[in-house]
Amino acid sequence: MTGIAAASFFSNTCRFGGCGLHFPTLADLIEHIEDNHIDTDPRVLEKQELQQPTYVALSYINRFMTDAARREQESLKKKIQPKLSLTLSSSVSRGNVSTPPRHSSGSLTPPVTPPITPSSSFRSSTPTGSEYDEEEVDYEESDSDESWTTESAISSEAILSSMCMNGGEEKPFACPVPGCKKRYKNVNGIKYHAKNGHRTQIRVRKPFKCRCGKSYKTAQGLRHHTINFHPPVSAEIIRKMQQ
């Protein structure tokens, strides 16, 4: 092996015929060389042996990646893939997904998802949504802006409910916000879009309203407000006021 050939292995760069491809590991480089630059045809090997009877490269005899090793590697990849999918799904349900870079938007129409209302089972923990049932329309129109707040992210439940389970779908993760046609290939893309794409568009109802006009998203918030700003008046104070 020449010095240049040896150096190519240390740099993980293929030097065969000016190929120049770079690989992350030595194993990947060797596999590339065996697949693309070394002949495995028995007739070619026999011809080379006849031409050079005193020397035959070991690469033709002892392959680094044998057929058995390749089959084992493919089998291992198939076993790892379902576990990776389960890990991603679990990460979405917990909402623990790191912020990824932005992705380009898709052109497919997102599936129709049911409207997210204050009566949803996850309203108290992750309130989201921008559309409500028809029977609430009259109340919404007469309500003031004080009864609304903005939400900076879409819940994991909403993302999972809009996920396309078709295995052939290139971008299965669709934005659940009605009218948004954004689709993404992975969980990180849709989570980043959900966190930043509709920061000022999503309005969430604050259904717990005080007689003074203030509204709150939870009963605990309304109770805290009442205790601090509208404390109960004792019977003794009422009698003194009537005197």
UniProtKB/Swiss-Prot annotation:
What Gene Ontology molecular function terms does this protein carry? transcription corepressor activity; zinc ion binding
ZnF segments: C2H2-type: 12-37, 173-198, 208-230
What ranges does the record list as Low complexity composition bias?
Answer: 118-130
GO BP annotation list: lipid metabolic process; negative regulation of transcription by RNA polymerase II
- What tissue specificity does the UniProt entry give? Highest expression in testis with moderate levels in colon, placenta, prostate and ovary and low levels in brain, spleen, liver and small intestine.
Specify where the region named Disordered lies, as residue ranges.
89-151
Source taxon at top rank: Eukaryota
Where does it live in the cell?
Nucleus
Spell out the residues of the site Breakpoint for translocation to form JAZF1-SUZ12 oncogene: 129-130
- Polar residues: compositionally biased ranges: 89-108
Classification via SUPFAM superfamilies: beta-beta-alpha zinc fingers
A single GO cellular-component term from the record reads:
fibrillar center
Entry keywords, A to Z:
Chromosomal rearrangement, Lipid metabolism, Metal-binding, Nucleus, Phosphoprotein, Proto-oncogene, Repeat, Transcription, Transcription regulation, Zinc, Zinc-finger
Q: What does this protein do?
A: Acts as a transcriptional corepressor of orphan nuclear receptor NR2C2. Inhibits expression of the gluconeogenesis enzyme PCK2 through inhibition of NR2C2 activity. Also involved in transcriptional activation of NAMPT by promoting expression of PPARA and PPARD. Plays a role in lipid metabolism by suppressing lipogenesis, increasing lipolysis and decreasing lipid accumulation in adipose tissue. Plays a role in glucose homeostasis by improving glucose metabolism and insulin sensitivity.
Quote additional remarks: Under hypoxic conditions, the precursor SUZ12 RNA undergoes regulated trans-splicing with the JAZF1 RNA, resulting in a chimeric isoform which may be protective against apoptosis. The chimeric transcript is characterized by JAZF1 exons 1-3 joined to SUZ12 exon 2-16. The chimeric transcript is expressed primarily in the endometrium from late secretory and early proliferative phases of the menstrual cycle, but not in normal myometrium at any phase of the cycle. Its expression is slightly induced by low levels of progesterone, but suppressed by both estrogen and high levels of progesterone.
What is the name listed in the Swiss-Prot or TrEMBL entry for this protein?
Answer: Juxtaposed with another zinc finger protein 1
Give the species.
Homo sapiens (Human)
